Amino acid sequence: MNYSQFLNMIPEATLMVVLLITFIADFCSSKSADRKWFNPLVCLLMVAHIVINIFPTEATEAFGGMYTTGSAAGVLKTILALGTLIVMVQAKEWLSRKDTAFKEGEFYMLIISTLLGMNMMVSANHFLLFFLGLEMASVPMACLVAFDKYRHNSAEAGAKFILTATFSSGVMIYGISLLYAACGTLYFDDIAKVISASPLTIAGMVFFFSGLGFKISLVPFHFWTADSYQGAPTTVTGYLSVVSKGAAAFTLCAILMKVFQPMLEYWTVLLYIVIVLSITIANLFAIRQSDLKRFMAFSSISQAGYIMLAVVGNSAMSVSALTYYVLIYVVANLSVFTIISSIEEHNNGTVQMDSYNGLYKTNPRLAFLMTLALFSLGGIPPFAGMFSKFFVFMAAVGTHDIHTTLGAWAYGVVFIALVNTVISLYYYLLIVKAMFIKHSDNPLPTFQSACSTKLALAICTVGIVAFGICSFVFDWISVAVNA
């Protein structure tokens, strides 16, 4: 084996170093001691990883072309690493509890392992490497979902997650086997050269799409989402809702546009149907929720529909819009989950929406920051979420002629998405109404968040405001994608 090939895998190599140092530091230090230095150490290692890999790199490959990377994949890996860093910073308060402090090292090692698997997925040019990366991300994620294993809800959520992940992986493997039977290869480039629309390849594409649809929580593959989000620790739920979803969505986009390009008409229609169902059904279910984590679960299903809307444009603009949307979604959604986690720690673990009644009077800063994040998720200007939705809508219709069948479908789906954006504003404003207008006989007491929570919220809030105002962010992503 030529170990110099690892030099072409700098993002993965640096993550392996971060994982190794984290393991050694955890192994060599006493878990009974006060380890205030451990979280800053891991976070600094992640910052170093981001700094090393933040600039777009030239296209490289390794392992006989099974692994390929370029500037577009590099940008997404940086965004995923940023989301992971925010989760690590935000997790400090939760991991300081007596029942979780002794598992702090395990948490960081699991979360870094999932990120490593996602990086492999993003850079895969072969279905074998893609599947290995997917499982490398899924197995540690199941452990994270069941991290509070002595809580019934967390153990149940972990069981549901692993069963669903197993089933979806089986469906995906079956689809890949059909594609191999039809094309005789598992390399993405080689499949794209020989694939054509036949019953076998169409079935393979549908099964593969269905398997990855489970990972992204697209309707009708979403049934596990609400229960797993509700039962998992809030910090893990935030990570699952943004980083995992972003990696899977980017990978699906790349495979559809690269491998299944000759079958464009088939997967585009399939995407139209799934997008409309995801956005509409998730919005209708979100309105009925009283538990905030279940509420955010259906919100994430709806956001997944918007993310995939960019793919139907089938252009470089699609990849740019999807990557930018994931970036904005990371900071906005993690801001919401950071606040939920902080309030949960000071409110006896309650995440019911009515417990937020009158939050503005007792904790005005948290109420204000929550409002900013919800406005961004809803697409209200001038926050970054509005621009991300605008670019997604532009990407969806940009290359389509309205006089063609696919073009008419594209414009129709964008119109439905616009209508659903208004519906989503209604249910996001339900939380704002609870915080600013509704009164409570037993309001949440005034409290001071931990410094780590304040830092995570500062990073997210700066992103929500700055990424919308600074147009160079989208320009930088576009240049990287087109490089």
Q: Predicted segments — roles?
A:
Residues 1-483:
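Alpha-helical transmembrane segments of multi-pass membrane proteins predominantly involved
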